[in-house]
Amino acid sequence: MKHSASESKPLSSGLAIYRRLLRYGFPYWRSFCVAVVAMIAYAAITPFFAKLIQPLIDGSFIDNDPTVLRQVSLMLIGLSVLRGIAGFLSEYCSGSVGRRVIADLRRDIFDQLLNLPCSFYDNASGGQLLSKLLYNTEQVSASLQQGIITCIREGFTVIGLMALMVYQNPVLSLVFLVLGPVLGLSVRFVSKRFRRLSMRIQESMGKVSHVTQEVIDAQRIVKVFNGKDYEAAKFATENDRNQKRQMKLIATDALGGGVIHLISVAGVAGILYVVSLDSVRQTITPGSLMAFIAAMAMMLSPIRRLSQVVSVMQRGIAAGDSIFAMLDLPRERDRGRISLKRARGSIEYRHVSLVYDDRHGAAVDDVSLVIPAGKTVALVGQSGSGKTSLVRLLPRLYEATAGEILIDGHDIRELTLESLRRQIAYVGQEVTLFNDTVASNIAYGCLDRVGLDAVREAARAANALDFIETLPQGFDTLVGQQGIVLSGGQRQRIAIARALLKNAPILILDEATSALDAESERYVQQALEVLMQNRTTLVIAHRLSTIQNADQICVMRGGRIIECGTHAQLMAARGGYADLYAMQFGYSSVPEAVAVHAVRR
C-alpha cells in the first residue's frame, strides 16, 4: 500500500491525526480525568523528594538538629505512599482507556471491512488489512496510553523540578534553560524520522502477514508443488526488510535519546562549573546546592523518557494515518428507499455496461436482457466473455457503469441493499464455508430466525442429510476452515441447503457442478433441480450438458450477448452456441454436431 502522500504531510497533519485518535478516548473521559489528575499528583510529589535534601543537610548535619532527620524520614514514607497510589491510578486508568480505544478502533475497522465495496478487495492485500486490525491498533493504543502518561506525568515532573530549581537559585537555572531550544530542535528532527520509518514498518508488517496468510491458505498447493523453498525465500525477504527497518528505528531512538541525554548532562556540567565560581558558591548553602543538583539529576530521567516517547507517538500517528485512510474510504452506496418484502422474480437488464478499469475495455457492454419470473436463463461463453460480471451486477456487488437493472420493475438502486440481497441466493463453484458447525453454515444469515427442524429439512432437500448424520457430531460437527473436513460434493450440498433455507425468489448458480465427480454431480444436480423450482434462476455454465433444459440460453462474447434462444433454436441457428457445442462434445464441425443433435432428438 502506498504511503508516499502521508509521508510528505506537514507536522500539523500529525497533530490532526492525534486529535482524531484522542476523540476515541472521549467516551471514557471519567477514567481519563482520574488518570490525568493522578499523573499531575505524581509529578507534583516528585520535586518534594529533591526539596527534602535541603533540610536534611542544613538541619541535620549543619545545625545538628536530630528532629529534622526524623521529620524527613516520615515525610519520605508519606510521599512515597502518595506517589505509589498516584502511579497506580495513572497506569490503571490510562490502560483502561487504551484497551477500550483498541476495542473501538477494531470494531470500526471490522465494520468498515464489512461495508466496503467488492472493488476495494480486488486490489487489497488480506495481510495488510489484518495488520491494520491487529498491529496498527496496538501501536495507536501504545501511542495514546504511553504518550499521554509520559507527556503529562513526565512533563509536569520536569516543570515541577524546574520550578524548584528556579526557586532554589534563579541564576543557575538560566544555564539549564539555555539548552531548551537545542533540545526542541533535536526532538523535532527525531520525530520526523520516526514517522517515516514507522509508516514503512507498518507496510512491511502487512507484507509479512500477507505472505504468511497465503502460505496458510494454500498449504496443500505449496506442498504438492514443492514450493516450500520459494515461499521461505519470499518470507525471508519481507521479514529481513522489516527487521532492517526496525533496526533503523531502534538506531534513531538510541541516537536521539543519547544526544538529548548528552545535551542534558552538558547543562548539568555547565551548572556545576558555575557553582565552582567563588562569587556563586558564597550565595548558596550546602543543602540548597544539593537540592538543586538533586533536582537536576532527577530531571534527566523524565527528559530522556520524554525524548523516547516521540518514537511511540510517531508510530501511533503513522498507524492512525493508515487506519483512518481506510476508514475514510467510501462504503457501498445504499441510498435506496424501497424495501422489497418478496419479489416475484422478474429481472430486466437495460443497456447495462460495466467497466472495472478505464485502462481496459468494458467487461459488460450494452447488454439488454429480460428474464420472466420463475424462468431459468443460462449464460454461456468462453472465459472472460462477461458472464460472471453480468451476474455480479444483480446483487450490486459492483455498480453498473451505464444502464439500469430492474427487479419487478424496480431499479435495484432504488431498493435498500438489505432488501435487494434478501431476494437472491447464490451457489458457486468455490463454496465458502466458515469454521463453524454444519448447522450454522446452513443457517448462515438467518441463524436467529430458524430452528434445527428447518435446517434438517433444507439438508434433506439438498441430499445432504445422509452424510451429515454420519459425521461425528452430526449438525454440530465443526467443518474446519473452508469446510476442509468435507468433500467437494458435500460442501456443495451444504451450500445448496443454505440457499434452500434462505428461500429467495432469485437464484444464481455459478458453475455449481463443474468441479465434481460423476457421483457427486448426480447428487448435487438432483438437489439443484429441487432448489430451482419456482425460482428465477441465472445459471453460469461452461458444461453445456447441464443447461440444455434452460428456458433461455444466452451466449456472451466480449461483454455482449450475441444470441439467445432455447437449446434447439440455437443449435438450428448454427451460431456461437453451436460452435461451443461442437467444440465441447468433440465434433469436427458445426454441421456434424447439428446433424447428430437432430438425430438424437
UniProtKB/Swiss-Prot annotation:
ABC transmembrane type-1 domain segment(s): 34-315
InterPro entries: AAA+_ATPase, ABC1_TM_dom, ABC1_TM_sf, ABC_transporter-like_ATP-bd, ABC_transporter-like_CS, ABC_transpr_lipidA, P-loop_NTPase, Type_1_exporter
SUPFAM superfamilies with a match to the protein in the record: ABC transporter transmembrane region, P-loop containing nucleoside triphosphate hydrolases
Entry keywords, A to Z: ATP-binding, Cell inner membrane, Cell membrane, Lipid transport, Membrane, Nucleotide-binding, Translocase, Transmembrane, Transmembrane helix, Transport
Transmembrane segments: 33-53, 72-92, 158-178, 255-275, 283-303
EC code(s) of this entry: 7.5.2.6
Enzyme class: translocase
GO CC list: plasma membrane
Database matches in Pfam families: ABC_membrane (PF00664), ABC_tran (PF00005)
Record-listed ATP binding positions: 381-388
Domain ABC transporter: 347-583
Subcellular location: Cell inner membrane
Organism domain of life: Bacteria
Domains (record comment): In MsbA the ATP-binding domain (NBD) and the transmembrane domain (TMD) are fused.
Assembly description: Homodimer.
Similarity remark: Belongs to the ABC transporter superfamily. Lipid exporter (TC 3.A.1.106) family.
Protein role: Involved in lipopolysaccharide (LPS) biosynthesis. Translocates lipid A-core from the inner to the outer leaflet of the inner membrane. Transmembrane domains (TMD) form a pore in the inner membrane and the ATP-binding domain (NBD) is responsible for energy generation.
Protein name: ATP-dependent lipid A-core flippase
Annotated organism of origin: Methylococcus capsulatus (strain ATCC 33009 / NCIMB 11132 / Bath)
